[in-house]
């Protein structure tokens, strides 16, 4: 069994960071690849929601999604929030896995405790379990941003998902930040001056 871990929302200016972990065997992973699984950024939103449902409802797939709010990111830092979320996933799911793969190049020092942990750059393109985790993290972020968009339509979050697009930055300059913005990001980039 392999545990794959990935995140969504790391570079967003607004909303939460979501980190997901998925554990399953290689046969199940292959079944998901046959369903069209790949890096969530390369899937349509409808396909992501379809795959999310299949992942969450599969008897032989175990998963965990951790949410870190904008407030937590502002008070603790993005890096600390990422590490805490990954630790929480490892505590819950690592006993089920022989191999642990994290997307990216940072193990947050956790490979000292988990000797079977590997970081894989572009892992969501190479390891099915990471791609499955990518789907769960991204659909969680998508859902949050659609809910927030209903409250603050002017920022275009239904399209930009909270990333720093031209329209989003112009809306911050014109309307100011919302309570859901990561104020540490906005201050760093002088959006309030």
UniProtKB/Swiss-Prot annotation:
Residues 1-193 form the RNase H type-2 domain. GO terms for cellular component: cytoplasm; ribonuclease H2 complex. Its main location: cytoplasm. Its EC number is 3.1.26.4. Pfam families: RNase_HII. GO terms for biological process: DNA replication, removal of RNA primer; mismatch repair. A divalent metal cation binds at residues 6-7, 103. Gene3D superfamilies: Ribonuclease H-like superfamily/Ribonuclease H. It is found in: Cytoplasm. InterPro entries: RNase_HII (IPR022898), RNase_HII/HIII (IPR001352), RNase_HII/HIII_dom (IPR024567), RNaseH-like_sf (IPR012337), RNaseH_sf (IPR036397). It catalyses: Endonucleolytic cleavage to 5'-phosphomonoester. Keywords: Cytoplasm, Endonuclease, Hydrolase, Manganese, Metal-binding, Nuclease. Its cofactor is Mn(2+); Mg(2+). It is an enzyme of class 3 (hydrolase). GO terms for molecular function: manganese ion binding; RNA binding; RNA-DNA hybrid ribonuclease activity. It comes from the Bacteria. Manganese or magnesium. Binds 1 divalent metal ion per monomer in the absence of substrate. May bind a second metal ion after substrate binding. PANTHER family: RIBONUCLEASE H2 SUBUNIT A (PTHR10954), RIBONUCLEASE HII (PTHR10954:SF18). Belongs to the RNase HII family. Endonuclease that specifically degrades the RNA of RNA-DNA hybrids. This is Ribonuclease HII.
């Amino acid at each position: 069994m392999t545990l794959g871990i990935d995140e969504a929302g790391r570079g967003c200016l607004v909303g939460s960071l979501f980190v997901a972990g998925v554990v399953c065997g290689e046969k199940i992973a292959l079944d998901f690849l046959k369903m069209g699984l790949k890096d969530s950024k390369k899937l349509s939103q409808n396909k992501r929601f379809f795959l999310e449902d299949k992942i969450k409802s599969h008897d032989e797939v175990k998963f965990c999604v951790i949410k870190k709010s904008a407030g937590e990111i502002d008070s603790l830092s993005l890096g600390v929030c990422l590490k805490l979320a990954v630790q929480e996933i490892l505590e819950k799911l690592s006993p089920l896995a022989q191999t642990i793969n994290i997307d990216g190049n940072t193990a947050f020092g956790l490979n000292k405790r988990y000797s079977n942990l590997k970081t894989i750059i572009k892992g969501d393109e190479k390891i099915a379990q990471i791609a499955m985790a990518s789907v769960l993290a991204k659909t969680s972020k998508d859902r949050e941003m659609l809910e927030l968009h209903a409250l603050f339509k002017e920022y275009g979050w239904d399209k930009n998902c909270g990333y720093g697009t031209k329209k989003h930055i112009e809306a911050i300059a014109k309307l100011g930040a919302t309570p859901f913005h990561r104020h540490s990001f906005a201050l760093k980039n002088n959006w309030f001056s």
